Design a protein with these regions (language model features):
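PLP-dependent amino-acid enzyme catalytic core
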Residues: 1-362
């Protein structure tokens, strides 16, 4: 069954890498590896890598130093806080990014204000509030929360918007956030080498605004430019702005509005990061618009491993790359996708699980 699946060939602290051995034997005969971000800094998601790095870069710039001169002990010191002063970092989030910004602000002695979209659960709200941030749930979608946070930052003395998406005139901090995400990609690449794999033949990565996807795709496209992996971007079908943009021959970005209702809360973003899109449209092989059932199925696959394969706790936004890969390998109705991706007995597949059970009640 591939109901709701749409795809298009594009014409335009160390976390774990886990080998899914029996799943590999059953499917591609070679290997499927999962980069598991459920342990990152005890925050259950990769997002903190971007926000914390961008905040560090901003502080370094303001005090006239290079970030390399500010190890964590210095960056979090009272001496540097006095030199930099008091700032308020604003952001919008579906959960993980805002939690990372709040976590970093607390450790840097700064303030954080977080705006969350309509439909946000109490668990996600509480996770951010516990970090000492001012947090609210608004009656608008994610993209409108971004605009709200940006407007508030502009009106606040020493207010800074730390958002993992870019728009005209706002590009430096999103670029830093994407660079921060690069930590995860470099780890995965190194861990694959430790497992005897020079580099993956296929990379499946999820996208909301496309910042993580841009970081992942950009890394592999640059590092292995002579023989890059087949890059596949997975979106929630309710917020598939990148897929819709790829369908346009012009390559212009298409926005998706409305409530963006999906179980993949972290991917419920209807307006793409312009920086990320420049990378993705030039290097991604396939964009896929994925229904909720695909994510739910993959979450169950991770939770019920075959044989001695590791048990992985993956949230709805984290599991969809495996869901798409599994569908391409197993479903007869998706054999054209498998052929387009050239998945075969020689494939070494990397899937990214970006989060653990960030909302276990749900």
């Amino acid at each position: 069954m591939t109901e709701g699946l749409k795809w298009t060939v594009n014409h335009v602290a160390r976390s774990d890498d886990k080998h899914l051995e029996l799943m590999s034997e059953e499917n591609v005969k070679k290997s499927i590896h999962c980069k598991d971000e459920s342990y990152r800094f005890g925050l259950n998601a990769f997002k903190v890598l971007g926000g914390s790095y961008a905040m560090g870069r901003y502080i370094a710039k303001e005090v006239g130093k290079d970030i390399s001169e500010l190890p964590y002990a210095v960056l979090s010191s009272e001496e540097l806080r006095k030199e930099f002063g008091q700032a308020t970092f604003f952001t919008a989030t579906d959960g993980n990014h805002g939690r990372g910004v709040a976590w970093a602000a607390k450790r840097l002695g700064q303030k954080a204000v977080v705006r969350m979209p309509k439909g946000t659960t109490k668990t996600r709200f509480d996770n951010i509030a516990k970090e000492g941030a001012t947090v609210t749930i608004e009656e608008v979608n994610y993209d409108d929360c971004v605009r709200m946070a940006a407007a508030e930052a502009a009106k606040t003395e020493h207010g800074i918007i730390v958002q993992d998406t870019a728009w005209d005139g706002y590009e430096e901090i999103p670029s830093w956030i994407m660079q921060g995400y690069g930590t995860m990609v470099m780890e995965a690449d190194q861990q694959l080498k430790e497992a005897g794999i020079d580099h993956p033949t296929h990379v499946f990565v999820q996208a909301g605004v496309g910042s993580l996807a841009g970081a992942v795709v950009g890394y592999f496209a640059h590092k292995y430019k002579e023989n890059p992996p087949v890059m596949v971007v997975c979106e929630a079908s309710a917020a598939d702005c990148l897929y819709r943009s790829a369908m346009k021959e012009s390559g212009d970005l298409v926005n998706v509005g409305g409530d963006l209702q999906t179980i993949m809360a972290g991917l419920a973003c209807g307006e793409a990061n312009t920086i990320g899109w420049d990378i993705l449209r030039n290097h991604v092989s396939v964009f896929a618009s994925c229904p909720d059932w695909m994510s739910a199925k993959a979450t169950r696959i991770y939770a019920n491993p075959l044989g001695n394969d590791p048990h992985i706790v993956s949230g709805e936004s984290g599991s969809v790359p495996l869901g798409l890969c599994f569908t391409a390998l197993h479903d007869e109705d998706a054999k054209d996708l498998k052929e387009a991706l050239k998945l075969d007995e020689n494939s070494n597949v990397l899937v990214i699980s970006t989060e653990g059970d960030t909302d276990p009640v749900r």
